[in-house]
């Protein structure tokens, strides 16, 4: 226990605490900014929540006509887009029984097609299994409700990536800095080497994961309570449009009770993986590069690979699939495992059990024995690759340029900010006509040539006289 206390004290250095506090404050600031920023459809997250608050007093029979009436009387493009989105979500909730019927009908169609073709393969098994799973949801009645507060907690991509950065910083302080200062050399002479120390570091990482999760997502929960409509924890999970296709018969409260343990487990796996990288590599530049490349590759596999691709296992056997935990509950996907439909949630669970066991074992046992290179003594002379102290001048210069002045950390933060901040021009429109005008002008943008004149004349033939006059004057 004393070793654990010492590790916690060594982790809470001034530099580490300041960086973690900065990230902790940055998360809600960017979240509030995003909530009040007009998106590409012309409305803010606050407008979306406000519209749900306005229609919450209407009955199930009156809510769709009310939204349709608001859409017809709206003049601004953003208001029209907002009403269209809310109408689509409300219609989906009110027609949930039809959605369940369509799942069963699709299963029957696939079964009939496979019987005629004589192929009782994966498609038929998958359809039958999907139908059985969704049949348990019969009788579920989703409510038309504002899900912004819940999604701000469970599907906030910015918070997920801030948590990943915080885990990396903690792993770096737990493992790499002591190792780089050669403070662990004497432990190799003890009976248990560094195994007990690394086990304590692993325990501290688990504690840090739980604390980070409670702080980051707890702050998001406070923001949701202050700025969004209240969340009805007794409503079915399918009331949230993003979880409309969920196969789980859970209330929102039960969903949250399952969500956070899965999130914590996924973060533990990622933290252990960062610790393993720090234990295996001796150069801080290699640690940064290896960690960044790993996260980028995982994110690319998760976001770009289709669920129907033969590489789908790379999408679902993926740390980012667990970090973005909501997908484990919102989708029901089976992949072809030797002709048998295996659910991706089960697959990820098996993947987690194997990987976290391997990472904990590797972290606690790596470098338990001496790994220094030895000289090979031959008659008359000694030959060895590491006969003396050797430093790569290139890596030394990289270290001087990036690490002492925190330049590398600043560059990483700047890169994340650039990715988050879309530099593209954000346009807002007051009417649908302005959208048409903008598309028209973009289409014929450029010097006025004979070919452009010909295209303009052809397009004006199909336009009425008032509209033609408006375009010419515009």
Model regions: which residues?
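Aromatic- and glycine-rich beta-strand/loop motifs that create alpha-glucan
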Residues: 1-20, 373-411
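Extracytoplasmic loops/domains of multi-pass membrane proteins
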Residues: 66-110
